[in-house]
Amino acid sequence: MAKNKNNQAIWNTRIKKNSSSLFQKVGNSLDIDKRLYKEDIKGSIVHVEMLFKQKIISFKIKNKIIYGLNKIEREISSKKFEFNKKYEDIHMNIEKRLFQIIGEEAGYVHTARSRNDQVITDFKLWLKSATKEINNLSLIHISEPTRRVF
């Protein structure tokens, strides 16, 4: 189960009873949403740039966060990143690793952005990319018969 910086399950701040193992399995989306890592990192970088432009964070903090996010992207791309199912999704895995790399400044990633904002942004970016890929594949299939005829 995903935990906050105080090592509590995210939902556990109000609910004191442990969830069933079935609930934990159903709530764990990591195996599905690993594919969103590029979008999650891209969305976080853009968000941090906005925080800097709005003078919410300093140039130094912005660069530190972006450095950490880029390092995580390289780790995932090179298959050196260790996903942990106890953090239940890609967002929490990346967040936990960012805290390990840069420390408390990682907490700024959620300034003025909810988890729902993060999830929907990731999904929209992924959908945009997947749509382009489908379009490109369909163009290849459409042009293939033409090449054979001429």
Model feature map: region roles:
Residues 2-143, 147:
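A helix-coil-helix interface module used to build multimeric assemblies
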